[in-house]
A protein has these predicted regions:
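Non-catalytic, conserved peripheral segments adjacent to functional cores
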Residues: 1-89
């Protein structure tokens, strides 16, 4: 069993509609906060999506990943997670 297969099994991950795999580990009773594990494998992409709440990303393992952020659907910035001790990102 590969590390990826092990993580998918142990964390009970399922395919995410925007790409990759995920499992929810917490959701508060008011649906204001949720925590998920999210994993992209090599050559997988996460599709652009609009946020309705702040999103906090944590990087645990693997190759660095570039996160693209656009507040106006025209210009964007990018942040590389997992590089130069950059292991979390808050997107508002």
């Amino acid at each position: 069993m590969t590390v990826i297969q092990h993580l998918i099994k142990e964390l009970k991950m399922i395919a995410h509609p925007e790409g990759g795999h995920f499992s929810e580990s917490f959701r508060d009773e008011n649906n204001n906060v949720s925590l998920i594990y999210y994993m992209l494998q090599k050559d997988e992409r996460s599709h652009w999506h609009r946020l309705t709440k702040n999103e906090i990303l944590h990087f645990y393992k693997g190759d660095p990943i570039t996160i693209y952020i656009s507040k106006d659907d025209v210009d964007f910035t990018s942040v590389i997670l997992g590089e130069n001790n950059n292991f979390h990102l808050v997107v508002e």
